[in-house]
């Protein structure tokens, strides 16, 4: 299993090739390619490499699938017996990113091809 930990939007995200993740809003168009250069850790068949603070020569390639809004969070404040009530809502915007490959030490790790089902008759 190959994975990497990248920093984006002030958060650390564990990513694997072939999967999508919701990260903080990125100011790029849909279907645009992007590269995460702040790779903090890379785990591959040969072991794990931890960066100090980042892994030199490592990059994660991805593609933007869509932009969206998360579920609404409601904040309700009230003071009992005083008639003070405030209700606010917030929907955080996000970007859905498909991770295509993890590049490290001259190699590119992509999603493994799924084995085709063999039917026995």
Curated annotation (Swiss-Prot):
Keywords: Ribonucleoprotein, Ribosomal protein, RNA-binding, rRNA-binding
PROSITE patterns noted in UniProt: RIBOSOMAL_L21 (PS01169)
UniProt keyword Ribosomal protein present: yes
Gene Ontology biological-process annotations: translation
InterPro entries: bL21-like, bL21-like_sf, Ribosomal_bL21, Ribosomal_bL21_CS
Any GO CC annotation of this UniProt entry: ribonucleoprotein complex
GO MF assignments: rRNA binding; structural constituent of ribosome
SUPFAM superfamilies in UniProt: L21p-like
Role noted for this protein: This protein binds to 23S rRNA in the presence of protein L20.
Subunit structure: Part of the 50S ribosomal subunit. Contacts protein L20.
Annotated PANTHER family: 50S RIBOSOMAL PROTEIN L21, LARGE RIBOSOMAL SUBUNIT PROTEIN BL21M
Family per record: Belongs to the bacterial ribosomal protein bL21 family.
Protein name as it appears in the record: Large ribosomal subunit protein bL21
């Amino acid at each position: 299993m190959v994975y990497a930990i990248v920093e984006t939007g002030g958060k650390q995200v564990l990513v694997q090739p072939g999967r999508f993740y919701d990260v903080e809003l990125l100011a790029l168009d849909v279907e645009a390619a992007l590269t995460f250069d702040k790779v903090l850790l890379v785990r591959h068949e040969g072991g794990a490499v931890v960066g100090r603070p980042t892994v030199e020569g490592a990059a994660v390639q991805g593609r933007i699938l869509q932009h969206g809004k998360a579920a609404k969070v409601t904040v309700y404040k009230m003071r009992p017996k005083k008639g003070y009530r405030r209700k606010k809502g917030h929907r955080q915007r996000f970007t859905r990113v498909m991770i295509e490959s993890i590049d490290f030490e001259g190699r590119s790790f992509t999603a493994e091809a799924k084995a085709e089902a063999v039917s026995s008759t």
